[in-house]
Amino acid sequence: MEYRMKSLVALTAALTCTLALQGCTTHLAEGQKRELAIYEEKGLLVKEKSVGTAAVLGIFPGAGYFYTGHYVLGVTTLPLYPFLGPLWMPFDAAASAKSRNYYATKMEAERNKARELRELDHRLEDKQLSYEQHIREQRTIEAKYAAY
């Protein structure tokens, strides 16, 4: 009877820790996932980190976090690794790679959009375009880099 009680307490503690640590993951919000899918459809996706590689490295203590650039998490989660690491680290490292790719894609899209708009403005200033052509091309550029 005492053995069953200890087993039940251990199982409950493990379940509680697993559920509590789910909040430590670095997932994208639903809106960000939609944006990333749209960028991918438009061919603008930047793959800074491989999601598969991050997941595989997540099996090893801290490796997935180091790969995705989360060095502090890589070090601070080492004490937890023997207990719960193999359960959540591969998933969290993969989600972290997706997050990294999302922000890299967003930055690259903004940078390219700004560059193209600057070039367009220079063409207007040099009288190579009429104001109407400028507006039309500006809308085309904005639609190209929009995440909707």
Residue ranges of model-derived segments:
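Hydrophobic alpha-helical transmembrane segments
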Residues: 12, 52-56, 74-78
